[in-house]
């Protein structure tokens, strides 16, 4: 089911960088943004708050790297913790999207294989956002998604 369009910040959370992408309030155009080099959470939060204010963000889409069987990986658990903490700090609802193979797909689609500048991470975040706009799930408050690891992220994958 397609979610209600709104201004979204999509995150492809990695250990070194966070790929970022946003969409307009109507969900028509998806734009990769400059990737964020990971630092302390408080420093990341300042940058992400600025993006949210500048873009009037109403929700977050966070990629969960599930395995081929749709099960959470160790990195998925890290992404979920980060996404929940960020959503709570920003007081924004969020949705999870299965990001299985999204980086590979972004590398193929945009000719960015092997990129280490962050462009590949943000291209993957853009694919996650396009997937969310097409398939959902609806955004939910962080506390409603906390107990359901991978909820809504098992379908599809990019």
From Swiss-Prot:
Q: Which UniProt keywords apply?
A: Cytoplasm, Hydrolase, Nuclease, Ribosome biogenesis
* One Pfam family matching this protein: RuvX
Region of interest: Disordered: 138-158
Q: Where in the cell is it found?
A: Cytoplasm
Q: Its GO biological process terms?
A: rRNA 5'-end processing
Q: Which domain of life is it from?
A: Bacteria
Q: List the record's Gene Ontology CC terms alphabetically.
A: cytosol
Q: EC no.?
A: 3.1.-.-
Enzyme class, broadest EC rank:
hydrolase
**Family named by the database record:** Belongs to the YqgF nuclease family.
Its recorded name reads: Putative pre-16S rRNA nuclease
Q: Can you name the source organism? A: Synechococcus sp. (strain CC9605)
């Amino acid at each position: 089911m397609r979610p209600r369009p709104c201004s979204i910040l999509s995150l492809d959370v990695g250990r070194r960088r966070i790929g970022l992408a946003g969409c307009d309030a109507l969900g028509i155009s998806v734009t990769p943004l400059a990737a964020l080099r990971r630092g302390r959470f408080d420093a990341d939060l300042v940058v992400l708050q600025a993006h949210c204010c500048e873009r009037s963000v109403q929700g977050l889409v966070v990629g969960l790297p599930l395995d081929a069987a749709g099960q959470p990986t160790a990195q998925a658990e890290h992404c979920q913790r980060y996404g929940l903490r960020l959503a709570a700090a920003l007081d924004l609802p969020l949705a999870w999207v299965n990001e299985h193979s999204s980086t590979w797909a972004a590398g193929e689609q945009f000719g960015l294989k092997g990129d280490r500048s962050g462009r590949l991470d943000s291209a993957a975040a853009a694919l996650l956002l396009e997937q969310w706009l097409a398939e959902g799930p609806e955004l939910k408050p962080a506390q409603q998604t906390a107990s359901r690891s991978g909820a809504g992220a098992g379908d599809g994958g990019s």
